């Protein structure tokens, strides 16, 4: 067994014996969402890094948790492949894109392409997990047909460290699309949602969409003929490729104009950036300071009061949930729609089975 893994497992066993708590650390690019516990020691995963195996012909790559996400994507790009769910690449406090593969899976965050291609958990084939007892546990594998423990691998995606520290992960990857085109339309929000819902029922290579301030942008991806036919059918303004690429990258990494303004507003006044997960058919929600709509209406970013219970109330009434990403008191994030009692009980039982001693302090989205 790798010496670094042995050392990490021993740290966890010592913490369990001492009834101490550990905070799992990767690139520290999501601390505003995860929150910080001052009395928790750090289990730093960055030393366990590197590509373990890559089979381009099989569309599978296995990497250690501390591997920088930008490094993984560079390796894939050299072979014309990618992570199609557009995982955000956030910067740390020093402005570096230091996010890790383990952090990507633990947070389970996806970007503009999520609605079309699926999320992080849909691409996790297997992983090596260090649980709260200090045991290393293998789940899943490196091929789709090897399904032993497959559901557990998916369960870890988006668990924010509640079930243990991800050590290695095998991911399904896809070839880069042959053609990409961005179209722009001038539309009111209700018209944009209506159009997106209509287009979703048609055989169009619609890969991503976003509406903000009466402008709808869509990304078409696929075969050259399919993209060209869709452009002819839908109309709109064709955005030059280099501008379109920069636009979607900014949206993916949350460094475009909307997110910059939202964070500036949160610093100046008692407002916050919220993420709403809603049924796509939910109508426009008025009365917020600013709104950006993604995923055909399923994900909406809004700027509203930091302690605004109306945000959660409206999300719940629509059959969805709300999470405060930044802003508010302290380190800001984490104010969220409570889980239903039955679902909360399931979450707690799962966590107790993987971490019976409560060694790991999960990110705030999974802190009950």
Please state what every model-predicted region is:
Residues 5, 35-39, 46, 239-368:
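Conserved glycine-rich FAD pyrophosphate-binding loop
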Residues 23-24, 207-212, 291-295, 324:
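Short beta-strand
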Residues 1-24, 45-95, 109-142, 177-185:
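N-terminal glycine-rich flavin-associated loop
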Residues 24-30:
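Glycine-rich beta-strand-to-loop/alpha-helix junction loops that act as flexible
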Residues 70-72, 190-195, 225-232, 281-288, ...:
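Short, conserved charged micro-motifs
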Residues 180, 186-249, 253:
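A conserved active-site cap/scaffold subdomain adjacent to cofactor or substrate pockets
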Residues 85, 96-205, 209, 216:
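FAD-binding subdomain of flavoenzyme oxidoreductases
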């Amino acid at each position: 067994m790798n010496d670094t893994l042995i050392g990490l497992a021993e740290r966890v066993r010592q913490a369990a014996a001492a009834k101490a708590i550990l905070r799992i650390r990767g690139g520290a690019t999501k601390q505003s969402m995860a929150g910080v516990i001052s009395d928790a020691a750090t289990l730093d995963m960055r030393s366990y890094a590197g590509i373990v195996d890559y089979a381009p012909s099989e569309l599978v790559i296995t990497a250690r948790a501390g591997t920088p996400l930008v490094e993984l994507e560079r390796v894939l790009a050299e072979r014309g492949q990618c992570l199609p769910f557009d995982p955000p690449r956030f910067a740390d406090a020093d402005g570096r894109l230091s996010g890790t593969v383990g952090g990507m899976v633990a947070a389970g965050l996806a970007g503009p392409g999520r609605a079309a291609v699926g999320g992080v958990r849909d691409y996790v084939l297997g992983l090596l997990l260090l649980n709260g007892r200090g045991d290393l546990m293998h789940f899943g594998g490196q091929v789709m047909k090897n399904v032993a423990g497959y559901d557990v691998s998916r369960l870890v995606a988006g668990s924010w460290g509640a079930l243990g520290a991800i050590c290695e992960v095998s991911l399904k990857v896809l070839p880069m699309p042959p053609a990409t085109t961005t179209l722009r339309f001038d539309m009111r929000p209700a018209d944009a949602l209506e159009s997106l819902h209509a287009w979703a029922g048609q055989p169009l290579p619609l890969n991503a969409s976003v509406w903000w301030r009466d402008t709808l942008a869509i990304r078409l991806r696929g075969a050259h003929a399919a993209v060209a036919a869709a452009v002819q059918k839908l109309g709109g303004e064709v955005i030059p490729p280099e501008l379109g690429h920069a636009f979607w990258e900014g949206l993916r990494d949350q460094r475009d104009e909307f997110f910059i303004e939202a964070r500036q507003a949160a610093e100046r006044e008692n407002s916050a950036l919220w993420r709403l997960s809603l049924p796509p058919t939910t109508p426009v929600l008025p009365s917020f300071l600013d709104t950006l709509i993604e995923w055909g209406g399923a994900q909406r970013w809004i700027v509203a009061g930091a302690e605004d219970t109306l945000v959660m109330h409206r999300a719940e009434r629509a059959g969805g949930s709300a999470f405060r990403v930044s802003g508010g008191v302290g380190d800001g994030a984490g104010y969220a729609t409570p889980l239903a009692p039955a679902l909360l009980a399931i979450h707690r039982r799962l966590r107790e089975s993987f971490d019976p001693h409560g060694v790991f302090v999960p990110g705030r989205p999974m802190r009950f």
